[in-house]
Amino acid sequence: VISIVDYGMGNLRSVEKGFASQGIEVRVTEDPGDIEGSSGLVLPGVGAFGDCVRNLRERSMTGPIKDFIASGRPFLGICLGFQVLFESSEEAPGEEGLGIFGGKVVRFCVAEKKLKVPHMGWNRVSAPEQTRILEGIPQQSWFYFVHSYHVVSDEPGADVLLSDYGGEFEAGVISGNLSAFQFHPEKSSDYGLMILRNFSKLCLEN
């Protein structure tokens, strides 16, 4: 079964509905014990980096999430669930992220380009070729974003997705069993839902 991690904040229901619309059964769980028995794990999230890592820690989910990722089973991070995979964020000085990936999260500096923060709405994404999670999705497809901070990764072996908002930024990272995106697949129409379908196929193969 695919589990969606409930840590008290985030876009859980919209992610759950996204999977359901594709006929994919998932469970939303706040029990760390459910993580180990999952075939796939989804970490969604909207909100603040510091609140997220504190909630995960207080609910004893940090260790099980790291163990799950290390097991090689499919993992999907969405929005804030993408950012917390990194080491730190300017949004929460002194708070450590999960540290799965090297790198940090920084605030958009786009005022001089007359752009608003948060970056909100549809934007094009360029993606690496031949990754299973993005199978069937053309280059420069549109995806839906809502975020004020963006990732600056230090992960040389990973495939990186790119978008542009007053300059190029990282819209996602794919590395082995782990796929994580700044945009919201569940809100990104057909191509976003295709990501959820591709993820479920990977889970079935597991």
Language model regions located:
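Cysteine-nucleophile active-site neighborhood
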Residues: G47-M120
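Short, surface-exposed beta-strand/loop micro-motifs that present aromatic residues
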Residues: G167-I174
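Proline-centered loop/turn at the N-terminus of a beta-strand
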Residues: P74-L76, W142, N177
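Acyltransferase
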Residues: F181-N206
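An anion/phosphate-binding loop that grips the pyrophosphate of nucleotide cofactors and donors
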Residues: S38
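N-terminal beta1-alpha1 ligand-phosphate binding loop
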Residues: I2-I24, P185-E186
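Pocket-forming structural segment of enzyme catalytic cores
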Residues: S88-Y165
